[in-house]
Regions:
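Cytosolic regulatory regions built on CNB/CRP/Popeye-like sensor folds
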Residues: 1-153
């Protein structure tokens, strides 16, 4: 019963829309399900892991130096930067609410996602949208600093 609920949640994730039910079940079985309580840390900045996470339920908070960067929800993925670059984690992530996630390692990713151009394209679109949002924040912050400097001249 729990597996059916998880598979249904996984099916809602945009990066999994392209899998047929049997493939989706294989993806799920190749991953590792994690259950986190509110405020429980999934990973910390600078930790070394090469895993990607898909949120099955709940919300996760991405933060750096205790400043919130983003809140991700069911269907979203996270941990992609360290996963793709094989570098330490660039931020920390904790459960914003109780949450369930599917942890995907590189072996499973290359077996199921990499051969699927539509899934890879969806991942690229999400990363691009996140970069665009980050640029908007940077520009707004720069403008705020500039306005503050002019105010005190």
């Amino acid at each position: 019963m729990e597996t059916l609920k998880d598979l249904e949640a996984l099916k809602q994730a945009p990066i999994c829309h392209f899998f047929r039910d049997a493939e989706l079940e294989r993806v799920y079985n190749a991953g590792k399900k994690l259950t986190l309580k509110k405020d429980q840390v999934l990973f910390s900045e600078n930790s070394v892991q090469e895993t990607l996470y898909i949120i099955l339920s709940g919300k996760m908070e991405v933060y750096k130096k205790q400043k919130q960067i983003a809140v991700r929800e069911a269907g979203d993925f996270l941990g992609e930067m360290a996963f793709l670059e094989s570098n330490p984690r660039s931020a920390s992530v904790r459960a914003f609410t109780d949450a369930e996630l599917l942890e995907i390692d590189k072996k499973a990713f290359f077996k199921f996602f990499a051969p699927n151009p539509k899934a890879v394209w969806e991942i690229l679109k999400v990363i691009s949208a996140r970069n665009r949002a980050d640029l908007d924040v940077i520009v707004a912050s720069y403008q705020e600093i500039r306005n503050s400097r002019e105010k005190y001249r």
